[in-house]
Amino acid sequence: MPGDFKGWHSRGFLQHFDSPERIQHLVFRTKDSLPSAVLAALPSDSRAKRRIVASWLDRGEGTAILLSAAVANIVQQTLLHFDGARYRLMAWCIMPNHVHAVMEPLDGFPVGSTVRGWKAISAASINRLNETSGPVWARDYFDRYARS
């Protein structure tokens, strides 16, 4: 595995696969998109966990800050900023409480670092716009690499 790419790894909640030039579907969500009671009751089975999380995300729970055109524009501009330099962004969809992105990481720029960058940069801008502080995004993200 070249550079800083980790292959299969986990920070305790979700398994991730990080590899250069491997197309990834990524989903990251706002901090308040899932009620804490739902998070606490998530099963350990990863397939069931993904199904429950997806169901709750589709409900648009939380403050749904991404419904704001100004906030959604911040997220979109953040996604586009390093397109072609650190990754190849193929598609994205900004939902009321989560974001989907399909991208291919370029050598030297692991997926985890890219997602952390997207979250940090967009959160700072969103907090500045809304005159708020604190976390905007949930800690983890979901990824699935495209199989050929």
Predicted regions and their residues:
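Short catalytic/metal-binding and nucleic-acid-binding patches
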Residues: 1-148
